[in-house]
Amino acid sequence: MPVFLRRLLQSISAVLSVLALAAGLPLAAQDDITTQDATSGYNGVFITGPSSNPLSFLNGAAARTTGNPAPYDFHDFAPFTYIDSKLPKWIDVQGEERFRYEGYDNSNLKLGVNDSYLLNRFRLQVDLRAASWFRVTAQVQDARSGLQNPPIGPPNTVRWDLKLAYAEVGDPEKHWFSLRVGRQLINYNNTIIANSEWRNQARSYDAAVLNLNAKREHLGIFAASPVVPQAYGVSPHQEGNNIYGAYGRIDDLVPHSNLEPFFLWRVQPAEVVEPARAKTTGHENEKAAGLRFKAQAFKSLDYSGEVIFEGGKVGPEAIRAAATQAGAAYQFLDAAAKPRVFAQYDFASGNSGPATNGVHSTFDTIEPTAHDRFGITDLFGWQNLEAVRAGTTIEPHRRLTFTIQGLDFWAPSALDSIYNTSGSSIAFNKTDHGHHVGAEVDSYSWYELNKHFNLGGGAGYFGAGEFLTNVTTSHSYTTYYFALNFKDNGKK
């Protein structure tokens, strides 16, 4: 039996035994279908723009906490739904098209490294349903850039790739049991494992996912390997780069709430041990355990909190890291333009002595979302970072929203690196020049034309603090974008 599947079966057996003994609860699934549209609003949220399923509903208009019942200003256009209606009942077709123009000045805080370009992404999906409890899904994706400075390739250009290819027994939305095997999306928790939809190619996993559902208890158990995008042909996954995990959800312990305990185990054959010190790599065996709580009160107040602890070993160093986040949002439903104010705090540990202490205490964000995790400039990842966010969203017209937000960033360790969303080092100080990384202000807007089309745009500016001004050639970064999105699920 392949090692990948053997470890999945071992994980399933161990987790089921522990949960059955410790909780005595019926087991159920946290399903990636029900969470792929966002995971942090209570019972999911409605995405109005192409933001990459942002960390939380606190991020403003890109994620509504409820679907908007207001009528649209434009008539619907759904060609795949029409085609689907003419096909046999056991065939479903879906289509997506996304255009985005984006640009930036001073990439990675390097003076004069500027670019602007067009992005296009097309997806075509076919579902074959042999029975109500069995289906086979395939999706092809063509992602390309235009007018971009070289080199041209991933993540913006990945031509005619196989985005999805899986078989599924059971329906996770209807049945207590389902098993999906093949190339698929996994998006249980945007903070640490997600499909990162904002990127032009996004992220897929070659995986086996077992989902178990009861009335209030849900459990997903999975073994997965992230796909490494290639410019041409079918992209492979990286052998040995595997994630195993169990992600649970218990509903309504407090009215209108979700409690989500989870455990992840990640192994990699070669991971950089201390990016702030050298590029030396070593084998990684990392375990992460966490708990997230999210809830809604009085229809107007949303709040959430999360804590994650990491242990294990990377190269010769022991892993001891942690992260947490908490936030709240309140919407004035009876006021003009329905203003919604939000605030959020994030912390991820860093390494106070990367050259000397022999312990890897920089938090590993594993496979997170890449957009609006910490503002729309997308400069930083959840590693050696302390961030405060506050902002407001207004809705001056039905299905039209405007958001403005500000963020302030600090480095818990002045001697560790500051990291980007992929976990690579942007800059680090050999001596302590201060902890303030900088501040950011963003503004963006989304408008839903009809059920299948939306458009939006935004701009963000970041100004560097003393942590960066001593080691970067630019002390500011600017980004901007305009996007048009079409998605027709074509469901009968």
Regions found by a protein language model. Give the residues of each.
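Short sequence motifs at beta-strands and strand-loop junctions characteristic
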Residues: 87, 114-118, 156-161, 200-202, ...
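Signature for the C-terminal beta-barrel architecture of outer-membrane proteins
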Residues: 133, 173-179, 195-356, 395, ...
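N-terminal periplasmic/intermembrane-space "pro-region" immediately following the signal or transit peptide
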Residues: 2-8, 12, 16, 21-114, ...
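Outer-membrane beta-barrel "beta-signal"
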Residues: 32, 46, 64, 474-492
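Surface-exposed loop and membrane-interface regions of Gram-negative outer-membrane beta-barrel proteins
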Residues: 102-120, 130-179, 186, 190-195, ...
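Transmembrane beta-barrel strands of outer-membrane/channel proteins
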Residues: 95-103, 138-142, 181-183, 221-225, ...
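Extracellular/periplasmic loop regions
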Residues: 46-62, 68-71, 278-279, 306, ...
